[in-house]
């Protein structure tokens, strides 16, 4: 008997089938017809699961984000410092498992590009909520570092926003310099480490 696929699983399958298209053609240049063909479904079926192409894009990112968070919480432990936890949060090495890591980098770059030219506020609103999660996470562990005597920070909000801006800048730098995933990851880790060391003072 054929396996029953629930609606959410089918929705995820359709969204994930669009990754290669988005990476090769770009989000703006990819049509619903092409996504339907890639997913092996009729165009009308796409609209049973998604209102528009943007929902497909956001579903992909929700899937990647959920996977990243699950892996992160498995990797950390109570003995890790706040600095180590922040660096681990921005370690995207699990992209090698289940997803093509180079495609993941290209996809994120396309996401940011779409946000920059967005006139509908759909991308802007989505990524605002996405970076808000990053903000809350970084702030949590910076204060944890303060409380456990790991370091002293003059301005937690400024440091938090600087780390988030660094992530965006690293994506643009990777694109401009034609970096692969591994090199981009090394650059991101190096600069976040430097930023944390320069903007925190160890408690004496």
Predicted regions: what is each one?
Residues 40-50:
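Short hydrophobic/aromatic patch on the recognition helix
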Residues 8-16, 28-29, 49-73, 87, ...:
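An amphipathic alpha-helix adjacent to DNA-recognition modules
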Residues 59, 73-103, 159-163, 185-189, ...:
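Hydrophobic alpha-helical connector segments
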Residues 95-99, 140, 144, 160-182, ...:
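Amphipathic C-terminal alpha-helical segment
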Residues 1-25, 29-41, 55:
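Basic, helix-initiating cap at the start of DNA-binding domains
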Residues 24-27, 48, 77, 148:
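Helix-turn-helix/winged-helix DNA-binding modules
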Residues 85, 98-122, 172:
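Amphipathic alpha-helical segments used for helix-helix packing
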């Amino acid at each position: 008997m054929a396996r029953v696929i629930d609606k959410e699983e089918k929705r995820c399958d359709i969204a994930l089938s669009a990754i290669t298209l988005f990476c090769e053609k770009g989000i703006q240049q990819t049509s619903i017809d092409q996504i339907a063909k890639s997913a092996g479904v009729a165009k009308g079926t796409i609209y049973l699961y998604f209102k528009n192409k943007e929902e497909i894009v956001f579903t992909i990112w929700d899937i990647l984000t959920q996977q990243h968070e699950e892996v992160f919480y498995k990797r950390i432990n109570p003995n890790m410092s706040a600095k180590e936890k922040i660096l681990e949060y921005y370690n995207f090495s699990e992209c090698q498992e289940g997803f093509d890591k180079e495609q993941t980098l290209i996809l994120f770059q396309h996401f940011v590009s779409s946000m920059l030219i967005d006139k509908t506020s759909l991308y802007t609103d989505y990524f605002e909520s996405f970076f808000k999660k990053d903000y809350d996470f970084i702030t949590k562990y910076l204060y944890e570092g303060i409380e456990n005597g790991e370091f002293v920070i003059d301005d937690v909000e400024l440091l938090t926003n600087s780390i988030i801006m660094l992530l965006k800048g690293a994506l643009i730098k990777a694109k401009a310099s034609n970096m692969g995933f591994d090199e981009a990851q090394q650059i991101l880790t190096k600069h976040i480490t430097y930023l944390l060391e320069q903007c925190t003072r160890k408690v004496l």
